[in-house]
Amino acid sequence: MQLKYVICLGVAGNFAHHLEQAGELEDFKNIVTDVEDAPKGIFPFYLPASDSFLGLYSIGTDTLTLPPYEVNAQVEPEIAVLFDIVYNDVNEVVDLKANQFTTFNDCTIRKEGAKKISEKKSWGLNSKGIGNKWISIDTFEEGGIMDNYHLCSFVKRDGVVHPYGVDAPLLGYSYFYTKLKNWLIDKMNTQEDFGPLENIAMHLNDCNYPSQALISIGATAYAEFGEHNYLQRGDEVYVIAYDSRYDDADFSVSSTKVILYQVVR
């Protein structure tokens, strides 16, 4: 699917314990949320037609390219949802219509001194990864197909497969379905440029109000290997969404399973 004209956004802090494990709680110390388990905010990782570094299309498929300098980079295993954006007459977002979902690697550099989340998210071609297929969303609320899906991830290093993120049901997201949608709409309209966050309404304006958004809705907590090991060149990354009624958390292929596979270069 061609996403070069789609604004791409991510959600920070939508799974319990992820920010603590990633060492990023300090970045959000001055961000006040309405309730304790609310995500911290949203951030851009691709802005179509932008002249900034975020204007480079960074989403890859089978290759994850690390920067040419020494970095500490981690897989961030996520679900990405493709939404249609509905605006009112004054270009405020009034609805998000969920169409399809897939797996996503929101690979992140643990970068000291970064002022914005986006500075850790995009550094060149193949900074990100997206799954090998899309699953149509029948309804973005409880009772739909996404109720049955789990998200898991692995890194294969030197022939040994290690769980990287915990195996988590999508219903384990802190904010999901209507609660997430309403929160996203609010943040797209009202989030200010403050601390590590950015003014998303301004980005929508600068991108000429795109009709769709790819939103990566948050990374799972890390398994032990993922928490304590950064990526190395030659690693093989798997981010898998599977229907727990039919599939297992493995590399076998099925019509209901989405597998993102990347080799780290």
Language model features: what each stretch is:
Residues L197, S211-A223:
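Short, structured beta-strand/loop micro-motifs enriched in basic residues and often containing a Trp
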Residues F225-G234:
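Surface-exposed flexible segments
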Residues A16, A219-E224, Y242-D247:
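Short, charged beta-turn/beta-strand-edge "cap" motif at the junction between a beta-strand
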